[in-house]
Curated annotation (Swiss-Prot):
Gene Ontology annotations of biological process type: translation
Family: Belongs to the bacterial ribosomal protein bL19 family.
Name of encoding gene: rplS
Species name: Desulforudis audaxviator (strain MP104C)
Organism lineage string: Bacteria, Bacillati, Bacillota, Clostridia, Thermoanaerobacterales
MF terms in GO: structural constituent of ribosome
UniProt KW keywords: Ribonucleoprotein, Ribosomal protein
One Gene Ontology cellular component: cytosolic large ribosomal subunit
Summary of the function given for this chain in its UniProt record: This protein is located at the 30S-50S ribosomal subunit interface and may play a role in the structure and function of the aminoacyl-tRNA binding site.
Database matches in PANTHER family: LARGE RIBOSOMAL SUBUNIT PROTEIN BL19M, RIBOSOMAL PROTEIN L19
Protein's name in the database: Large ribosomal subunit protein bL19
Amino acid sequence: MNHIQTFAEEQLKPDIPEFRPGDTVRVHVKVVEGERQRIQVFEGVVIRRRGGGVSETFTVRRVSYGVGVERTFPLHSPRVDRIEVVRLGRVRRARLYYLRKLRGKAARIRERKTK
């Protein structure tokens, strides 16, 4: 195995929960303000996951004060403190961009039942 692959595997976080598009997640992000560091929570629906390995990212969407806000997070970033899966969603697409056009009850996602 070459050096780049070994380095990339060392950077992978082992404690990432299993989640997919449609799931509602709570992402705890480390925010640095001057010398202070605090944790900011961003909760919303995962609308996509892309890439693989160290460069894998996921996008979370939520509506805040009537405005849709989307944030893309690198999955293995040291800034992402932890990810909690709040609710499992049942969707039939891998990219949920159609949620951008929907408002209110139309933007709801069915719940996935676990066995």
